[in-house]
């Protein structure tokens, strides 16, 4: 979705849990670097990702879902991230290329709102099979979500569906 506060992170977690319950190997990459909420939604906010000089190992939830988020590597989750676009997109790329995800059937990427640097970087550098948009039943929100749908289509990424949340 192009808009914040519509439930993208919550839907990402719910989809990941459902896929894991069906026996799939699932990972969640929290690409919302300036507003990461995935660790809290999985109740792993006190956990920390560990790593070596070569790789970062994601935190695994009780459901067996592998999770990588900036809040799993910073000391305190309420630290402000005051970085420019290139630094943020660099972290997102690192979470894709430098994290040992192992064998996954699905990697769910929780995106920040908008059609800016991070969504563009993700769509250009990660082999995405499709996107699911999350919206709420408000005209202004629908217009903003349409921009994200158009962006995905311009990037030749299939829109698998739209979840209308809070309806």
Question: Which residues are covered by each model-predicted region?
Answer:
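Phosphate-binding loop that captures ATP/GTP phosphates
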Residues: 22-77, 89
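Phosphate-binding/switch loop-helix module in NTP-utilizing enzymes
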Residues: 72-122
């Amino acid at each position: 979705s192009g808009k914040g506060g519509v439930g993208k992170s919550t839907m990402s977690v719910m989809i990941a849990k459902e896929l894991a319950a069906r026996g799939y190997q699932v990972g969640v990459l929290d690409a919302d670097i300036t507003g990461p909420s995935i660790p809290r939604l999985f109740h792993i906010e006190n956990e920390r990702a560990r790593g070596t000089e070569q790789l970062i190992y994601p935190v695994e939830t009780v459901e067996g879902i592998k999770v990588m988020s900036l809040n799993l590597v910073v000391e305190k989750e309420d630290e402000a991230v005051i970085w420019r676009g290139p630094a943020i997109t660099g972290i997102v790329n690192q979470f894709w290329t430098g994290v040992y995800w192992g064998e996954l059937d699905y990697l769910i990427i929780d995106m920040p709102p908008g059609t800016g640097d991070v969504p563009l970087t993700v769509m250009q550098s990660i082999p995405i099979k499709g996107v699911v948009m999350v919206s709420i039943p408000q005209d202004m929100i629908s217009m903003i979500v349409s921009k994200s749908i158009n962006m995905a289509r311009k990037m030749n990424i299939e829109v698998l569906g739209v979840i209308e949340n809070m309806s």
